A protein has these predicted regions:
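Catalytic Walker B motif of ABC-type/P-loop ATPase nucleotide-binding domains
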Residues: 174-177
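Helix-to-loop junction immediately C-terminal to a conserved catalytic motif
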Residues: 66
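Conserved ABC transporter NBD signature motif
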Residues: 74-85, 90
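Conserved ABC ATPase signature
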Residues: 149-153
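ABC transporter nucleotide-binding domain
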Residues: 192-279
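Conserved ABC ATPase "signature" region
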Residues: 114, 118, 125-145
Length: 281
């Protein structure tokens, strides 16, 4: 991804009732149906975790919502706009936390962020205004590393830089796809605190994908459980458990082992979800 990709001038639009409104989202690759009617609503300022095992369709869903992949069916409203595939004009008000500094390893952290803020400042990317470099550095805890080359940062520091890049346009909605993959426990805890702090201080809506229930509970106001391309439950883990207390359970295996804390341990309502029981009602 080009960190300096063009963003377009956009007039301030009325605030939509939902930061994200997804209805019947479908995605197929040939005859293989990956998403089979995903429905998801995210209110302004709400943090939602899209929770599910690998292969459930989490990354595909996020890529469609970011405009990086074309859907085959359904309706998507991102901040009130139904984006056309490949059209970046609507992306001026969203943030994507992904590794987007690959060609700039020799740049300092400050140089890269200054370049981005200068690029976006004249384009009015958000009605909330563009962040300055010092604000970004402070927000992600990289003030002390401001003059360090990106290639010299630790893995956790680089991930913080990813967040800073996602915050440049002061977005109203941020997408994070498996944000702590490969982190050790200490780095994971620090990153969790960073995301919670940003959510509290900025009232920014966030959608993050994870297969870790503990992470979802720590970061999100609510979870949406995605299994085999469908949202099978939505709410806090407590409300989901109360609503679906009829005794089935969700669990999944990966690499022949169960996660230390899977959905089955905290949300005892689905057991071995299959195509014969795709929905919970």
């Amino acid at each position: 991804m080009d960190v300096a990709r063009t963003r377009f001038v956009r007039k301030q639009a009325p605030i939509p009732p939902y930061a994200l409104d997804v209805r019947g989202l479908k995605m197929s690759y040939g005859n293989t149906e990956v998403l089979r009617g995903v429905d998801l609503k995210v209110a302004p300022g709400e943090v939602v975790a899209l929770l599910g095992p690998n292969g459930a369709g989490k990354t595909t869903t996020i890529e469609i919502l970011e405009g990086l992949r074309c859907r085959t069916g359904g309706k998507v409203l991102v901040l009130g706009t139904d984006p056309e595939c490949g059209d970046e004009r609507w992306q001026a008000r969203i943030g994507m936390v992904l590794q987007s500094w690959g060609d700039h390893r020799r740049w300092s952290v400050r140089t890269l962020l200054a370049h981005l803020t200068a690029h976006y400042s004249g384009l009015v990317p958000s009605p909330r205004g563009v962040q300055n470099v010092d604000q970004l550095l402070e927000a992600v805890g990289l003030t002390a590393q401001a003059h360090r080359r990106i290639g010299q940062l630790s893995g956790g520091q680089r991930r913080r830089l990813d967040v800073a890049i996602g915050l440049v346009g002061n977005p109203e909605l941020i997408f994070l796809d498996e944000p702590t993959t490969g982190f050790d426990p200490e780095a994971r805890a620090a990153f969790h605190e960073l995301i919670r702090s940003i959510a509290r201080q900025r009232s920014t809506a966030m959608v993050l994908t994870t297969h870790d229930l503990t992470e979802a509970e720590l970061l999100a106001d609510s979870v949406a459980i995605l299994v085999s391309g469908r949202i099978v439950a939505r709410g806090t883990t407590e409300t989901i458990a109360r609503k679906h207390s009829w005794g089935t359970r969700v669990s999944w295996r990966e690499h022949e082992r169960l996660y230390s804390k899977t959905v089955s341990e905290s949300v005892p309502f689905v057991r071995d979800l299959s195509l014969t029981k795709p929905h919970i009602t």
